[in-house]
């Protein structure tokens, strides 16, 4: 966290099964100054997920009430479940100097880029569709029909990677984490993100 600058906002998207969540978790655990925006969702919690940590789990009625209040920076219906990013939560973290990670799908990413053109888009790619299919099957949480739907959707999502600023191939977790960190550090060093420090330096020269 920096006292001199507003935090960057990083949009990290990927097709389901690419390892996005694992990568983001490693980045948060191993590096300072980063916070993840905890999304709201109407889907049931998976084993090991905690409310307020992995997601804010809410009912469909609660979610639709928040939509009516314009509380979301973006939201989407994904396979019958709502997912949304709180505008207030993101703004508070960025204002405090944290770099904020939005772990969202390509539909939500487009909404955020329209609202926040300065946000940095990062797309995580699988090394191949065979590896992606194996990862989805290995999770053991989805039926064969759902897996086929996810693979079909993955092709469309990967086509949308052209709309992002950076792409990272997740073939090796450690290398992919390092690639993500390089992107984060490069964005932190942009002159436009150091204006507060420069002004303070000149004022006290």
From Swiss-Prot:
Primary localization class, coarse: cytoplasm
InterPro entries registered for this protein in UniProt: GK/Ca_channel_bsu, Guanylate_kin-like_dom, Guanylate_kinase, Guanylate_kinase_CS, P-loop_NTPase
Domain Guanylate kinase-like: 7-185
Localization per record: Cytoplasm
Keyword Nucleotide-binding carried by entry: yes
Catalysis performed (reactions): GMP + ATP = GDP + ADP
Protein keywords: ATP-binding, Cytoplasm, Kinase, Nucleotide-binding, Transferase
A GO CC annotation given for this chain: cytosol
Enzyme Commission designation: 2.7.4.8
CDD domains: GMPK
GO molecular function, one term: guanylate kinase activity
UniProt KW Transferase keyword: yes
Binding site for ATP: 14-21
UniProt enzyme class: transferase
Record family assignment: Belongs to the guanylate kinase family.
PANTHER family linked to this entry: GUANYLATE KINASE, GUANYLATE KINASE-RELATED
Functional note: Essential for recycling GMP and indirectly, cGMP.
Protein name as catalogued: Guanylate kinase
Organism in which the protein naturally occurs: Neisseria gonorrhoeae (strain ATCC 700825 / FA 1090)
């Amino acid at each position: 966290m920096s006292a001199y600058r507003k935090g960057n906002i990083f949009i990290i998207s990927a097709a389901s099964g690419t390892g996005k969540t694992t990568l983001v978790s490693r980045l948060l655990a191993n590096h300072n100054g980063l916070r993840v925006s905890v999304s709201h969702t109407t889907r049931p919690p998976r084993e090991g997920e905690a409310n307020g940590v992995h997601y804010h789990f809410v009912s469909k009625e609660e979610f639709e009430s928040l939509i009516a209040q314009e509380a979301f920076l973006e939201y989407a219906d994904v396979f019958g479940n709502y997912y949304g990013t709180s505008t207030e939560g993101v703004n508070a973290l960025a204002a405090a100097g944290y770099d904020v990670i939005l772990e969202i799908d390509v539909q939500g990413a487009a909404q955020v880029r329209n609202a926040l053109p300065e946000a940095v888009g990062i797309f995580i790619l699988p090394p191949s569709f065979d590896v992606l299919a194996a990862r989805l099957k290995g999770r053991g949480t989805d039926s064969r029909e759902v897996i086929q739907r996810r693979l079909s959707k993955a092709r469309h999502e990967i086509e949308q990677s052209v709309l992002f600023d950076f792409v990272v191939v997740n073939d090796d977790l450690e290398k992919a984490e390092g690639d993500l960190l390089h992107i984060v550090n490069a964005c932190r060093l942009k002159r436009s993100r150091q204006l507060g420090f420069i002004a303070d330096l000149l004022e006290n020269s």
